[in-house]
């Protein structure tokens, strides 16, 4: 996910960070979910479908955590942020504890 999304999320009042900023770039699947949970995160956003599906398997052990697959098409950072903002304005991003959800729905 483009790092520029962090600025938008913070602007929207969402506490967020990028895995790379935390030194988690090498973590995969359940290990990344565990690291996120251990530092107080309740949700992970990803554009990678295979990663999201794999990480969601860890949800059986962490039923209060959610994985959200962002299905906005791959474009450059600034354009992605524009599309993310537009989607946010028309559709709530609602993580569901213990689940993998796709957002925005219908994409």
Labelled PLM ranges:
Residues 3-11, 30, 53-107:
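Acidic, PIN/NYN-like endoribonuclease modules and their adjacent C-terminal/linker elements
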Residues 34-37, 89:
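Surface-exposed alpha-helical segments enriched in charged/polar residues
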Residues 1-27:
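Active-site-proximal, substrate-binding regions of enzyme catalytic domains
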Residues 29, 36-58:
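Acidic, metal-binding active-site segment of PIN/NYN-like and related structure-specific nucleases
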């Amino acid at each position: 996910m483009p790092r520029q999304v962090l600025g938008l999320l913070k602007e929207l009042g969402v506490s967020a960070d990028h895995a790379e900023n935390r030194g988690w770039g090498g973590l995969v699947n359940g290990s990344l979910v565990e690291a996120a949970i251990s530092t107080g995160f309740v949700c992970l956003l990803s554009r990678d479908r295979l990663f999201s599906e794999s990480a969601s398997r860890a949800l059986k052990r962490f039923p209060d955590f959610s994985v959200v697959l962002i299905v906005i098409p791959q474009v450059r950072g600034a354009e992605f942020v524009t599309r993310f903002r537009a989607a946010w304005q028309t559709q709530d991003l609602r993580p569901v504890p213990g689940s993998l959800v796709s957002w925005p729905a219908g994409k």
